[in-house]
UniProtKB/Swiss-Prot annotation:
Phosphoenolpyruvate binds at residues 23, 95, 123, 170, 347, 389. Belongs to the EPSP synthase family. Its EC number is 2.5.1.19. 3-phosphoshikimate binds at residues 23-24, 28, 168, 170, 316, 343. GO terms for cellular component: cytoplasm. It catalyses: 3-phosphoshikimate + phosphoenolpyruvate = 5-O-(1-carboxyvinyl)-3-phosphoshikimate + phosphate. The lineage of its organism: Bacteria, Bacillati, Bacillota, Bacilli, Bacillales. It comes from Bacillus cereus (strain ATCC 14579 / DSM 31 / CCUG 7414 / JCM 2152 / NBRC 15305 / NCIMB 9373 / NCTC 2599 / NRRL B-3711). Pathway: Metabolic intermediate biosynthesis; chorismate biosynthesis; chorismate from D-erythrose 4-phosphate and phosphoenolpyruvate: step 6/7. This is 3-phosphoshikimate 1-carboxyvinyltransferase.
Length: 429
């Protein structure tokens, strides 16, 4: 369990930074390329542990995948070409891999067993296994399909019209992917619109997808045709440096090639509402996945209320938004964020516990947290608990704190941002 020592940043963070590829898009590019017909080239791929787990799983099913840094080539097998894996499919720490891949495996006529690490073993799978069973999938797991390992014997499925109790792109995507080989029209309706990378990328691969309000539909029997994918930078990774630029004195950062998918840019809306000083320059308007260069500098922030429809658009950024709120004037209330409880950790509890160790005034609620602003942070020993987003949030907090901060289990950040600490060090010079 490696630890990192973070020293206070006295002269601010300054410079340009190219954000690594979007994790959600990288996963999907490998998966969709694997079930497409033809060769897909992916540029800007995120070579983090989670996305490498996706590559490993599809290689195990006979897909020829070549990876060289952030460029990946996938020779697709088509929807019917995957081979029965000889070994257990290990997703590591990746919830995206296990949930989306379950949708693909549910309609593939062979047996597979899927498992992950200790964190995955605690994460709820019934939200995916239940609708897949309704489609006719033979799928099981511990506690009646609630937890991994999952066993899946794929076969013929029937389309369903599913009303999801949660706004989850992973649930929606698993059902849509299962629907590719189901008989009829598969529809998913959500309480709020979740991130739409699956719909955008299916369309890029030639699949017709229909959107009507909060409902997404596709017809079974459509084939995927290989295409080249350019992955923009991950706005969830950019969020840590956006907040750092806003709250660390004497800072000015230019973040290049940040993904600006409107279902993901809640962090931008929140920083604007809090009063942050920044500019957004779109660089590829009209692309399937828009991107921008963002310039941000030290700002005077104010507390706000965050809840409702915006939560699915920033669920992964809430840990670092909470940190920003500790430096804002007034009180920030985050609500409607129950999903935080079923992430890599219970992020309500971990954010509150670890920021409290650093001197923040913050309280947990059932569906979020209340943060009292203008806290003077003091260095301490804190822990990521194996959660990459908690680790990065604590590193930014450490830059601001008085005295040194020691982060235990710091290597967890490699899941989504392998070069994070190197970038932080470079910007602090």
């Amino acid at each position: 369990m490696k630890e990192r020592t973070i020293q206070p940043v006295n002269n601010g963070l300054n410079g340009n930074i190219t954000i690594p590829g979007d994790k959600s898009i990288s996963h999907r590019a490998v998966m969709f390329g694997s079930i497409a017909e033809g060769k897909t080239t992916i540029k800007g791929f995120l070579p983090g542990a989670d996305c490498l787990s996706t590559i490993s799983c599809f290689k195990e099913m006979g897909v020829e995948i070549t990876q060289n840094g952030d460029e990946v080539t996938v020779v697709g097998k088509g929807l019917e070409g995957l081979q029965e894996p000889k070994a257990v499919l290990d997703v590591g720490n990746s919830g995206t891999t296990i949930r989306l891949m379950s949708g693909i495996l549910a309609n593939t006529p062979f047996f597979s067993c899927v498992q992950g690490d200790e964190s995955i073993a605690k994460r709820p799978m019934k939200r995916v296994t239940n609708p897949l069973k309704q489609m006719g999938a033979n799928i099981d797991g511990r506690e009646e399909g609630t937890f991994t390992p999952l066993t899946i014997r794929g076969g013929d499925l029937k389309a369903i019209e599913y009303i999801s109790p949660v706004a989850s792109a992973q649930v929606k995507s698993a059902i849509l992917l299962a629907g590719l080989r189901a008989e009829g029209v598969t529809a998913v309706t959500e309480p709020h619109i979740s991130r739409d990378h699956t719909e955008r990328m299916l369309e890029a691969f030639g699949v017709k997808v229909t959107r009507e309000g909060k409902t997404v539909k596709l017809s079974g029997g459509q084939k995927l045709t290989a295409t080249d994918i350019q992955v923009p930078g991950d706005v969830s990774s950019a969020a840590f440096f956006l907040v750092a630029g806003a709250i660390i004195p004497n800072s000015k950062l230019v973040l290049q090639n940040v993904g600006m998918n409107p279902t993901r840019t809640g962090i931008i809306d929140v920083l604007e509402k809090m009063g942050a000083t920044f500019t957004v320059d779109l660089i590829n308007e009209g692309a399937s996945e828009p991107a921008a260069n963002i310039t941000i500098e030290t700002s005077s922030l104010k507390g706000i209320e965050i809840g409702g429809d915006i939560i699915p658009r920033l669920i992964d950024e809430i840990p670092v938004i909470a940190l920003a709120a500790t430096q804002a004037e007034g009180i920030t209330v985050i609500k409607d964020a129950h999903e935080l409880k079923v992430k890599e950790t219970n992020r309500i509890d971990t954010v509150v516990a670890e920021l409290t160790k650093l001197g923040a005034r913050i309280e947990a609620t059932d569906d979020g947290m209340i943060i009292y602003g203008k806290s003077a942070l003091k260095g301490n020993t804190v822990n990521s608990y194996g959660d990459h987003r908690i680790g990065m949030m604590l590193a930014i907090a450490g830059c601001l704190a008085e005295g040194k901060t020691i982060i235990e289990d710091a290597e967890a950040v490699g899941v989504s941002y392998p070069t994070f600490f190197d970038e932080l060090q470079k910007l602090a010079k």
